[in-house]
């Protein structure tokens, strides 16, 4: 019940933040099949928004996510029209994944707090097969529109999710490089740069990391310069960029990071940038900001996954991080 959710939230809040913070009215949410799951509980202090908790009764941990910060509102207070007045008993809040919630419309589509509209056909139950010999990144990434096929447990994340959308990067800068985008997420998370207020910072990161334009044959997007970044110089370059912005953030890159080390960084509220190549030579960089165990509803198969900003979408995706899938992997960590 909402009363129990508020009592639980109050205990969590007092333990995490102190007695000056209190829970507001819990907002119930369901899964994509309409089954009740839990509550989003906004947090306030001095009548000002200060974050929220996600309580999921289907998870053994109950508290499956939280974000705190001055003025930080709950997911249902974001996204323009997607506010508390948008949902009702007949149009409940739906959890797409632990970072993304939405409201189902009469046509069956879901509008989410990430500004996406998921067509009804995209949320019908359909199996997602992850190849053990992936030839495409679609074989190793589970996107938000596929999350209805999985049960999520043991979800952990950094305190705030950040993911620049590829189309927005191209619109703002007329450039795109996956590693520069991943580092831009990190710069935003640490308060070093915001591309919406100053898009030129993307090119600053581009230049500091020695990102270069791809060959003419690889330039496939009219009006947009596509780039590649050498792993050997990315950490030093990003560290120097941060210093130019007055930040003491230091980046370090290591080869073949274990999943446990990635999880430890996330537990310490620090994002990672992961770099990997499939055996066909397709390389990509993503920002690791969460992790969870996903169980296929139809297959029963359980997988340990890394929650990522995938460089293409604004919503959370999950990456199958199995070293045997990749020709090589590197990880960039951050410290002050």
Sequence positions of predicted segments:
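A short, sequence-level motif marking secondary-structure junctions
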Residues: 56-60, 115-119, 123-126, 291, ...
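Active-site signature of cysteine proteases
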Residues: 60, 78-108, 259-260, 267, ...
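Exposed beta-strand-loop-beta-strand "reactive/processing" segments of non-cytosolic proteins
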Residues: 16-58, 94-110
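Active-site-adjacent structural segments surrounding the nucleophilic cysteine of cysteine proteases
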Residues: 6, 10-22, 65-102, 106-227
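Residue-level detector of short, conserved catalytic/binding motifs and their immediate flanks
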Residues: 39, 51-53, 176, 286, ...
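Generic structural motif
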Residues: 20-26, 87-93, 247-254, 331
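Predominantly the structural core of cysteine protease catalytic domains
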Residues: 176, 184-185, 213-294, 298-301
């Amino acid at each position: 019940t909402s009363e129990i959710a508020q009592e639980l939230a109050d205990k969590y809040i007092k333990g995490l933040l102190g007695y000056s913070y209190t829970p507001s009215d819990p907002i119930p949410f369901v899964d994509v099949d309409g089954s009740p799951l839990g509550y989003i509980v906004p947090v306030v202090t001095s009548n000002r928004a200060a974050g929220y908790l996600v309580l999921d009764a289907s998870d053994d941990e109950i508290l499956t996510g939280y974000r705190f910060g001055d003025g930080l509102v709950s997911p249902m207070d974001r996204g323009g029209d997607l506010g508390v007045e948008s949902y009702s008993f007949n149009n409940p809040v739906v959890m797409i994944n632990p970072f993304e919630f939405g409201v189902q419309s009469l046509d069956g589509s879901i509008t989410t707090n990430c500004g996406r509209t998921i067509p009804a056909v995209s949320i019908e139950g359909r199996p997602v097969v992850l190849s053990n010999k992936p030839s495409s990144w679609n074989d190793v990434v589970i996107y938000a529109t596929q999350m209805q096929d999985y049960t999520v447990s043991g979800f952990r994340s950094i305190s705030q999710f950040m993911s620049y959308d590829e189309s927005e990067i191209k619109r703002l800068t007329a450039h795109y490089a996956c590693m520069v985008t991943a580092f831009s997420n990190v710069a935003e998370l640490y308060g070093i740069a915001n591309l919406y207020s100053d898009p030129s910072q993307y090119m600053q990161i581009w230049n500091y990391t020695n990102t270069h334009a791809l060959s003419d044959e690889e330039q496939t997007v009219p009006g947009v310069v596509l780039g590649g970044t050498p792993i050997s110089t990315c950490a030093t370059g990003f560290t120097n960029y941060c210093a130019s912005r007055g930040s003491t953030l230091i980046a370090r890159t290591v080869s073949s990071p274990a999943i446990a080390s990635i999880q430890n960084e996330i537990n310490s509220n620090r994002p990672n940038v992961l770099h990997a190549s499939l055996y066909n030579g397709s390389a990509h960089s993503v920002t690791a900001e969460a992790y969870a165990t996903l169980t296929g509803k139809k297959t029963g198969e359980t997988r340990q996954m890394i929650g990522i900003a995938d460089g293409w979408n604004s919503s959370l995706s999950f990456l199958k991080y199995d070293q045997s899938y990749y020709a090589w992997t590197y990880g960039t960590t951050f410290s002050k």
